[in-house]
Design a protein with these regions (language model features):
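N-terminal first-folded block
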Residues: 30-64
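Short arginine-rich
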Residues: 47-50, 75-85, 121-124
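Short amphipathic alpha-helices in soluble, non-transmembrane regions
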Residues: 70-74, 111-114
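Mid-chain, well-packed structural core segment of small domains
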Residues: 80-89, 95-99
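C-terminal structural segments of small proteins and small subunits
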Residues: 97-123
Length: 127
């Protein structure tokens, strides 16, 4: 039996976790990060790689539909915060890439969305 209330609770936790980066009380989500800052942030994000002005990670799922459920949850979160990844769907794998096309590189918003993506990836049952 599928427990919708548990999924709903987990989704609420994930969606309400807007990671914001501030400096002197000022929102810095759309400021480009230095290579050093990006690499420092990625220490906490297991499996994420920084290369060619993007951060990316490939996730594996037990079933194709688990991966699609993850994509749907990620798409909703991206719409909510207006920061959208490039997503590549494979058989039981999903690759997620963040960059700011406007700024030409990785911003704090990219890192914040990578953190949110990590949380969403643990809700691996499709709905």
């Amino acid at each position: 039996d599928f427990n919708w209330s548990s999924i709903y609770y987990c989704l609420l936790l994930a969606y309400n976790s807007n990671e914001k980066f501030t400096k002197n009380g000022e929102d810095t989500d759309m400021s480009l990060l230095s290579n050093e800052q990006i690499n420092d942030e990625l220490i906490e994000l297991n499996g994420w790689v920084f290369k060619d002005d993007v951060i990316t990670k490939t996730y594996s799922f037990d079933t194709y539909m688990d991966g699609i459920g993850f994509v749907n949850r990620l798409a909703e979160k991206a719409e909510e915060v207006n920061h959208h990844p490039d997503i590549q769907v494979g058989w039981c794998t999903i690759s997620v890439t963040f960059t700011s096309h406007d700024k030409g590189g990785v911003t704090a918003a990219c890192v914040g969305m990578a953190q949110a993506t990590e949380k969403l990836s643990h809700l691996n049952k499709y709905n």
